[in-house]
Design a protein with these regions (language model features):
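Structural signal for conserved beta-strand scaffold positions within catalytic alpha/beta enzyme cores
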Residues: 48, 109-111, 234
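Glycine-rich, Lys/Arg-enriched anion-binding loops that position phosphate/diphosphate groups
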Residues: 100-201
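Residue-level signal for inorganic ion chemistry
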Residues: 38, 77, 137, 185, ...
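N-terminal Rossmann-like or analogous alpha/beta NTP/dinucleotide-binding catalytic cores
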Residues: 16-103
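Residues at the starts of beta-strands that form the adenosine-phosphate
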Residues: 6-8, 45, 106
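Phosphate/ribose-recognition catalytic cores of enzymes acting on nucleotide-derived substrates
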Residues: 154-278, 282-286
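A non-catalytic, amphipathic alpha-helix used as a structural packing/dimerization or gating element
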Residues: 33, 136-143, 249-260
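ATP-dependent adenylation/pyrophosphate-handling site
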Residues: 1-23
Length: 286
């Protein structure tokens, strides 16, 4: 941007490991969430290049020449020290440096961020999510772990039996979810952040078999949002998912969860909630 160039992030629409193994690899950030994050950061373009057989077999030199320097017209390329690309991942930062003068771009290799001498990586973040340690995961990510999606109809247990409506999301199978349980959350609806309590799991107290779902009680929101795209940010772990002896016992526990969440926000007045607009007025992406 300082040099007057538009900014672009190059990534693949399908993770290379998924394409090569034939098995879905879960991701911390889905394509839709990544688009929203890039827009929030002010990135001009997000290139989601298809990872197909042609690109898998492309020699790394051709990848640099034909795609990065050719189709994208890159003039400043920024990579990490362990980047890899091209057939069998043979391309690296050294190759990019070697081709720099020939193709007329300038290479920037940035060092990895570390946390107490450990590289911050997706593996490290997944480990913390599996523990339910979203506060640590958020610190590693540099932003709250979030789940985006359209609000769908659930079983109406929240509104008809427990007395308070909830917003249900069905996360895609590729989304890496944290430990099942209840979390303090912040929910973005129509550019406004609200306080929330989010349960992730299979609703063990309710009879029947339910897929893994994300169900959120939203404070201070009293209107129909079915079909709306919302963003649920997890801020702190409350308790693990558990099966209660009755719906009445579950209702009592949820009231305690709401009190826990309210107390969390009281202790963190710096967190934007309850009607304050996000800077820039960003709308959640469809």
């Amino acid at each position: 941007q300082e040099l007057g160039y538009p900014t672009a992030i190059f990534t693949f629409s399908i993770a290379p490991l998924t394409q090569m193994s034939g098995q879905p690899q879960t991701v911390i950030t889905t394509n839709m969430e990544r688009r929203a994050n890039m827009e929030r950061m002010g990135i001009d373009y997000l290139v989601e290049y298809p990872f197909n057989e042609e690109i898998r077999r492309m020699m790394p030199e051709d990848f640099v020449k034909d795609i990065l320097a050719g189709r994208m017209g890159a003039r400043e390329i920024v990579v990490g020290p362990d980047c890899s690309f091209g057939y069998q991942g043979a391309g690296n930062a050294e190759l990019l440096k070697h081709m720099e003068k020939e193709l007329g771009y300038h290479l920037h290799v940035i060092e990895k961020e570390k946390d107490h001498m450990r590289d911050i990586s997706s593996t490290y973040i997944r480990e913390e999510l599996e523990k339910g340690n979203v506060e640590k995961a958020n610190a590693l990510l540099g932003e709250p772990y979030s789940i985006h999606g359209k609000v769908v109809h659930g079983n109406h247990i929240g509104s008809s039996i427990l007395g308070f409506p909830t917003a249900n999301l069905e996360p895609p199978a590729i989304k890496r979810l944290p430990r099942f349980g209840v979390y303090v959350s912040r929910v973005l609806v129509d550019n406004v952040y609200y306080r929330g309590v989010t349960n992730i799991g299979k609703k063990p107290t309710v009879e029947g078999q339910y897929p893994v779902g994300v169900e959120t009680y939203i404070f201070d929101l009293d209107r129909d949002i079915y079909g709306d795209t919302i963003e649920v940010q997890l801020l702190a772990f409350d308790r693990p998912e558990q099966k209660f002896a009755s719906l009445e016992e579950l209702k009592h526990r949820i009231e305690m969860d709401k009190e826990f969440a309210a107390g969390y926000f009281e202790r963190h007045p710096e967190i934007e909630v309850a009607g304050r607009q996000e800077e820039g007025g960003r709308k959640p992406l469809e």
